[in-house]
Amino acid sequence: MIKQRTIKRIVQATGVGLHTGKKVTLTMRPAAANTGIIYRRTDLNPPVDFPADAKSVRDTMLCTCLVNEHDVRISTVEHLNAALAGLGIDNLVIEVDAAEIPIMDGSAAPFVFLLLDAGIDELKCAKKFLRLKEAVRVEDGDKWAELAPYNGFSLDFTIDFNHPAIDASTQRYSLDFSADAFVRQISRARTFGFMRDIEYLQSRGLCLGGSFDCAIVVDDYRVLNEDGLRFEDEFVRHKMLDAIGDLFMCGHNIIGAFTAFKSGHALNNRLLQTVLAKQEAWELVTFEDGEEMPLAFRAPSAVLA
């Protein structure tokens, strides 16, 4: 049986908020089976909870925000959400003493490290997966994203950037998902932005935490970071990381094939909401019998040990 997962102990870290540039303390707490993923702002009195839910994603301009019915929001959840998806964490309470998750190094790797340091705990309840039964596709101009039936979780992502620093041969990436593949191939890919955009946003009091420490920064010709790229195709790998986090907003690991061209947070979320609204296109399944398990989600690999 594939079991639900949480962490073994409370783990805490501090970082900087991408938007405010101020210190943020992040605390992750184990949660009981069927709790789901809950983001909590402890800077408010009383604290406000934001369950991970595709319908709560309302603002996708610079990052993924969860917004409740009172217009209270928590920002920059996508990289942590990707780490949870990558490690198959079903139940967790995530507390921050600010309006945003810290940006860390702009990737999911620091969150993976924290979660593995806390230890993965398997619970006694069967893990629920969202399995695609029909293909669902959404489009926005020439951009599109699709989920289709597949016995596992595969991703195929293409970006289309006309930039000297981004070679045409590095604009597509495919992955047959597993926790090990996510940690090694995806989690370290950082977010990226143009120096001119960062300077403009900061002049308006936005993106105050943006720096070379938490993003790949490019000008019109090259990558400006002294250490360069972590992967030759780090840009498209990060877009895949974003998609993994965006799709996990349904609270379940997905069994299906994800394919996208120039997609971003908004289109990824529209795809997820379109799938969920089409009830005949998916089902929630558990795997009591090991023979039925998709390879991608069999017993935790060495990376989780």
Curated annotation (Swiss-Prot):
It catalyses: a UDP-3-O-[(3R)-3-hydroxyacyl]-N-acetyl-alpha-D-glucosamine + H2O = a UDP-3-O-[(3R)-3-hydroxyacyl]-alpha-D-glucosamine + acetate. It is an enzyme of class 3 (hydrolase). Pfam families: LpxC (PF03331). GO terms for cellular component: membrane. The keyword Hydrolase applies. Its EC number is 3.5.1.108. InterPro entries: Ribosomal_Su5_D2-typ_SF, UDP-acyl_GlcNac_deAcase, UDP-acyl_GlcNac_deAcase_C, UDP-acyl_N-AcGlcN_deAcase_N. Catalyzes the hydrolysis of UDP-3-O-myristoyl-N-acetylglucosamine to form UDP-3-O-myristoylglucosamine and acetate, the committed step in lipid A biosynthesis. This is UDP-3-O-acyl-N-acetylglucosamine deacetylase. The lineage of its organism: Bacteria, Pseudomonadati, Pseudomonadota, Gammaproteobacteria, Enterobacterales. The gene is lpxC.
